[in-house]
Amino acid sequence: VPANCLLPMKVGFCRAHVPRFYYNSSSGKCEGFTYGGCGANANNFQTKAQCEKACR
């Protein structure tokens, strides 16, 4: 698993409600979360498919 996929899920500090996906290293799966719109890290994907492709 690439290092960016091991970063913790980060909602960010803005107040938008953007559906995104992150790789959950505990479950070994890509899971959905609501992103605030800014202050992301590299474990933040627009689709589940993008997450799964990047983090297998």
From Swiss-Prot:
Serine protease inhibitor that is strongly active against trypsin (950 IU/mg) and moderately active against plasmin. Does not inhibit potassium channels (Kv), as well as metalloproteases, and cysteine proteases (papain and bromelain). Disulfide bonds join C5-C55, C14-C38, C30-C51. InterPro entries: Kunitz_BPTI (IPR002223), Kunitz_BPTI_sf (IPR036880), Prtase_inh_Kunz-CS (IPR020901), TFPI/VKTCI-like (IPR050098). The keyword Disulfide bond applies. The record marks R15, A16 as: Reactive bond for trypsin. This is PI-actitoxin-Afv2a. It comes from Anthopleura fuscoviridis (Sea anemone). Residues 5-55 form the BPTI/Kunitz inhibitor domain. Keywords: Disulfide bond, Nematocyst, Protease inhibitor, Secreted, Serine protease inhibitor. GO terms for molecular function: serine-type endopeptidase inhibitor activity. Belongs to the venom Kunitz-type family. Sea anemone type 2 potassium channel toxin subfamily.
